[in-house]
Curated annotation (Swiss-Prot):
Function: Plays a central role in cell adhesion in hematopoietic cells. Acts by activating the integrin beta-1-3 (ITGB1, ITGB2 and ITGB3). Required for integrin-mediated platelet adhesion and leukocyte adhesion to endothelial cells. Required for activation of integrin beta-2 (ITGB2) in polymorphonuclear granulocytes (PMNs).
Keyword 4Fe-4S in annotation: no
Protein name: Fermitin family homolog 3
Gene from which the chain derives: Fermt3
Biological source species: Mus musculus
Modified residues (Phosphothreonine): 589
Length: 665
């Protein structure tokens, strides 16, 4: 028993004194001194600490933090010897859940209690559960950017901070609905207002504030954002986060699974807001026509939100709608397909055959587009000088599996081009296809996109891909104005109530156009979306965002093995992209589907990847830790394993196996 003494007061056992500070990591904090042995269990030490403090309160959330090892002592049955704790250990007895300030994708601020002792993956899952966001594996936390000191100190506007620190959810129990919202949000007017902030789009930002926000001016600037992601396998305490720190909650992985407007109002709104701010802060580029479409959708969404027409379904209707959908699905399954139709679908390989104009950029050439007879079959594109030569050898044949597909479209100028970057031994071979009209462009663009992923036009998603492309093009078409009306919008939209165009477009368009030039163009584009409901408009905005060439690419500055210059590595949900830092051109693309394995050498901070056909790639990271690249690759592979049948069940162990690392503190 610890603390045995002789008659003179000397200790005769192997016990020793252990000092534990009470509270958070403060050298001035109150401390207690305990008499322990190496065989003392952590649970017994916790009990002694509470007895020494001698204060009645709920201590169930408290645990011991070992400062030198940056480790929580959570295994209460372990002894001090097993942990390796000696008398010089700096230990702190404090709460595991502490307040943090979150800046959400909609740029609003929220204060809540988060776990500082669990891996970040679990912490984010708990935060998303509190905020009613499904599929938390798509999100993560990143550090807020450091504020630069300004020569002239400006008073920053005060922000409303929604407080959820007192909201506690029972573990393992799904939140119930009450009055159309999760029950824990209906406790007070403040929490109800917080739910409306989460689930409803925010008004357009102040144009002056928008101009003052930092914006990336180059690819290296875009790499800075992705250097701030926190490690998913470590807790907040291990990463130097303190109570009250500001963190950003963002969608990290651009692979959105089972997005259902009925069950995902918060997730849908926050995803829309992240897309909107990506465009407004120029994190992602778009053309002038596309910006007008995005501005028109924002204007429409803002109008519906302000009018209160948020399209909420009554709780009684929700079950009926679900029942109708289930019956419709059952009807489709029961109808099935005729045996002859199924046989045709198995034996017939879809093809595209048509005249297209083709251009292959080469050095020291002035040749432009030339017309060819083009045949698209499986994932292969072949072109001939004329239709008569088609059965013979083609002028050139290209396998588009693993290629980059980039749209080059100007609807008003009737320009419908597809830029293909096809992998070749020398790098990426560039070729342009010019289509005659929207219908032809949509069919060939959809075929190219599927082929780049190794899929053919027989894939069930081909028809929906064509329709999505046509829908996006229709948004960019000028609204139904009569001849000569030009820039004068007709109907109730003419006064443009509440329309400040500078709050709807990126700053580079603010500099290029005056407000009186932007307003009629936005209203003209608005005529194409004026009939959409709020949910439909948000979904259309997200779909248009997803169709942009640079969508879903996270940038990291790296140096490839054997190279003397820095380059950019783009990470998407299905591929890695090597980009020339000087000109921004794609040099090479590697598909995850062709990847055999990847390894990280934490000592020299190098990532090595092996692909099919004995292709090996190795690089060191310059702008961020190699852990971030490792986690992106593992995270996207994990997300590709999700299945609808499993619902929202997550294999956390698999995620941590794919993304966890052994980098030293």
């Amino acid at each position: 028993m610890a603390g045995m003494k002789t008659a003179s007061g000397d200790y005769i056992d192997s016990s020793w004194e252990l000092r534990v500070f009470v509270g958070e990591e403060d050298p001035e904090a109150q401390s207690v001194t305990l008499r322990v042995t190496g065989e003392s269990h952590i649970g017994g030490v916790l009990l002694k600490i509470v007895e020494e403090i001698n204060r009645k309160q709920d201590w169930s959330d408290h645990a011991i933090w070992w400062e030198q090892k940056r480790q929580w002592l959570l295994q209460t049955h372990w002894t001090l010897d097993k942990y390796g704790i000696l008398a010089d250990a700096r230990l702190f007895f404090g709460p595991q859940h502490r307040p943090v300030i979150l800046r959400l994708p909609n740029r609003r601020v929220l204060r809540l209690r988060a776990s500082f002792s669990k891996p970040l993956f679990q912490t984010v899952a708990a935060i998303c559960r509190l905020l009613s966001i499904r599929h938390p594996e798509e999100l993560s936390l990143l550090r807020a950017p450091e504020k630069k000191e300004k020569k002239k100190k400006e008073k920053e506007p005060e922000e409303e901070v929604h407080d959820l620190t007192k909201v506690v959810l029972a573990g393992g129990v799904a939140p119930t609905l009450f009055r159309g919202m999760p029950a824990h949000f209906s406790d007070s007017a403040q929490t109800e207002a917080c739910y409306h902030m989460l689930s409803r789009p925010q008004p357009a930002p102040d144009p002056l504030l928008l101009q003052r926000l930092p914006r990336p001016s180059s690819l290296p600037d875009k790499t800075q954002l992705h250097s701030r992601w926190l490690d998913s396998s470590r807790c907040l305490m291990q990463q130097g986060i303190k109570a009250g720190d500001v963190l950003w909650l963002r969608f990290k992985y651009y692979s959105f699974f089972d997005l259902d407007p009925k069950t995902d109002p918060v997730r849908l709104t926050q995803l829309y807001e992240q897309a909107r701010w990506d465009l407004l802060t120029e994190e992602i580029d778009c053309t002038e026509e596309e910006m007008m479409v995005f501005a028109a959708l924002q204007y429409h969404i803002n109008k519906l939100t302000l009018s209160g027409d948020v399209g909420e379904l009554a709780s009684g209707d929700l079950g009926l709608d679900d029942l109708d959908a289930a019956l419709n699905n059952l009807e489709v399954k029961l109808k099935g397909s005729a045996p002859s139709d199924m046989l045709d679908s198995l034996t017939t390989i879809p093809e595209l055959k048509d005249h297209l104009r083709i251009f292959r950029p080469r050095k020291l050439t002035l040749k432009g587009y030339r017309q060819y007879w083009v045949v698209f079959k499986d994932t292969t594109l072949s072109y001939y000088k004329s239709q008569d030569e088609a059965p013979g050898d083609p002028t050139q044949q290209l396998n588009l599996k693993g290629c980059e597909v980039v749209p080059d479209v100007n609807v008003s100028g009737q320009k419908f081009c597809i830029k293909l970057l096809v992998p070749s031994p020398e790098g990426m071979s560039e070729i342009y296809l010019r289509c005659q009209d929207e219908q032809q462009y949509a069919q060939w663009m959809a075929a190219c996109r599927l082929a780049s992923k190794g899929r053919t036009m027989a894939d069930s998603s081909y028809a929906s891909e064509v329709q999505a492309i046509l829908a996006f093009l229709s948004l960019q078409r000028a609204g139904g104005s009569n001849g000569g009306s030009g820039n004068k919008p007709q109907g109730p939209e003419a006064p443009a109530e509440g329309l400040n165009p500078y709050g709807l477009v990126a700053p580079r368009f603010q500099r290029k156009f005056k407000a009186k030039q932007l307003t009629p163009r936005i209203l003209e584009a608005h005529q194409n979306v004026a009939q959409l409901s709020l949910t439909e408009a948000q979904l259309r905005f997200i779909q248009a965002w997803q169709s942009l060439p640079d969508f879903g690419i996270s940038y990291v500055m790296v140096r490839f093995k054997g190279s003397r210059k820095d380059e950019i590595l783009g990470i998407a949900n299905n591929r890695l992209i090597r980009i020339d830092l000087a000109v921004g051109d794609v040099v090479k693309t590697w598909r995850f589907s062709n990847m055999r394995q990847w390894n990280v050498n934490w000592d020299i901070r190098q990532v090595a990847i092996e692909f099919d056909e004995h292709i090996n790639v190795a690089f060191s990271c310059v702008s961020a830790s190699c852990r971030i690249v490792h986690e992106y690759i593992g995270g996207y592979i994990f997300l590709s394993t999700r299945e609808r049948a499993r619902g929202e069940e997550l294999d956390e162990d698999l995620f941590l196996q794919l993304t966890g690392g052994h980098e030293a503190f």
